[in-house]
Amino acid sequence: MRLKVEFTTEPFDLDEAPAHAVVAREVIQAAELDAVDVGPFGNTAEGGADAVLTAVDALLRKSLAAGATRVSLQVNVIGEGS
């Protein structure tokens, strides 16, 4: 099964990326995911279910530890491939 994750971390800082946002970006970019798109107001990535779920676990743990007060995410099934 293939999944797509969309997420944001808060609090926002329009002047520079806060530590929790940098950590979240590093987690997603280091994961074995496809179609990673990192932006200032939202991020998306796609991949196999195991890879996405592992990345989401790390994303939540590490961004909260780095100061995020809120993490909003959505996970969608986008296909049956690996």
Specify the residue positions occupied by each region the protein language model found.
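Charge-rich, low-complexity N-terminal segments
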Residues: 1-82
